[in-house]
A protein has these predicted regions:
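Structured alpha/beta reader/binder surfaces that contact nucleic acids or chromatin modification marks
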Residues: 1-169
Length: 169
């Protein structure tokens, strides 16, 4: 739903250590045969491809809050900067999720709402091999070939950027 511009927030169990804003790539894990029609490139295969990118300009922490003495189960709330909590209804609506769907995904734990801005869907979806992963070593970050999508998220760079840096050395 991100690629269709309907989803304004992505709910995740984790968040990167990066500060906002940062670029996030959209990997389509859809079933075989997913396609999109681009005015420039025509019909393109989407599944198992990076189909676009967005800027994450804000991350909200989702946490469970219940009323003292209530028998009602705690509900998802957004933790505010002054450590207050407000209901997560608007965030869940922007994420195209019901509270039950969010709870099922988060398995009763806390999570994060990644806010989506500057959405860019590629005319031609890109293969993972066009990106380079970054692995943390004792000498700093080191490029590594990406052969499969990360299970949640990973730090990547576009292969073209890495090649340009290497040529400039």
């Amino acid at each position: 739903m991100i690629w269709a511009g309907m989803k304004e927030v992505e709910v995740r169990k984790t968040r990167p250590t990066l500060e906002t804003p940062f670029k996030a790539y959209i990997y389509c894990t859809g079933h075989d045969g997913w396609v999109m029609k681009s005015p420039k490139a025509g019909v393109q295969k989407m599944d198992s491809r990076v189909i676009g990118e967005f800027t994450c300009d804000k991350i909200d922490r989702l946490t469970h809050v219940g009323a003292m003495g209530s028998n009602e189960p705690p509900k998802l709330h957004i933790e505010t900067s002054d450590l207050w909590h407000k209901p997560a209804n608007d965030l869940l609506q922007a994420a195209c999720l019901t509270e039950a769907e969010a709870e099922k995904y988060l398995k009763g734990g806390d999570g994060y709402g990644w806010h989506i801005s500057d959405l860019k869907i590629y005319d031609k979806p890109r293969k993972l091999q066009e990106f380079t992963g970054l692995r943390n070593t004792r000498f700093g970050m080191e490029p590594v070939e990406i052969t499969r999508p990360p299970q949640s998220w990973g730090y990547v760079r576009e292969l073209e950027e890495v090649r340009n840096e290497q040529e400039g050395e």
